[in-house]
Amino acid sequence: MATRRIVATEKSILEKDDHIGSSPAAGEKSNITPAVPLDVILKLLAFTLAMVVIPIGSYFVTVNSIFKGNSTYAGALAAIMANVVLVAYVVVAMNEDQTEQEKAKEGKKDR
């Protein structure tokens, strides 16, 4: 039977590094910052709330006051308002992406 020879330069199981995968060593602080900035999360939450409140609110406000009980027109207005909120979110997201690209270009020019 073959036996394994212990090499002095090889680390034993107790001497191995504390790194497991991509986690930091025992003495280091881990980076707990979120991958997505807080302002992006807040914008998403605001538009999610708007996507729920604005169409439903516009339906119930207009069904009896403006359209005199005609729920078809009030429903159509609610659908239009949902699309308005969606388009507004896309525009805000595109503008935010463009400003990030401009900041990256300015950062490269300064170097």
From Swiss-Prot:
Intervals, Lumenal compartment: 61-73
Keywords: Cytoplasmic vesicle, Endoplasmic reticulum, Membrane, Transmembrane, Transmembrane helix
Record's bilayer topology term: Multi-pass membrane protein
Gene Ontology biological-process entries: vacuolar proton-transporting V-type ATPase complex assembly
Main localization (coarse): endoplasmic reticulum
Cytoplasmic topological intervals: 1-39, 95-111
InterPro entries: Vma21
Gene Ontology CC: endoplasmic reticulum membrane; endoplasmic reticulum-Golgi intermediate compartment membrane; ER to Golgi transport vesicle membrane
Residues that span the membrane, as ranges: 40-60, 74-94
Motif (Prevents secretion from ER): 108-111
Pfam families on file: VMA21
Subcellular localization(s) per the UniProt record: Endoplasmic reticulum membrane; Endoplasmic reticulum-Golgi intermediate compartment membrane; Cytoplasmic vesicle, COPII-coated vesicle membrane
Family: Belongs to the VMA21 family.
Reported function: Required for the assembly of the V0 complex of the vacuolar ATPase (V-ATPase) in the endoplasmic reticulum.
Name of the molecule in the record: Vacuolar ATPase assembly integral membrane protein VMA21
Name of the gene encoding the protein in the UniProt record: VMA21
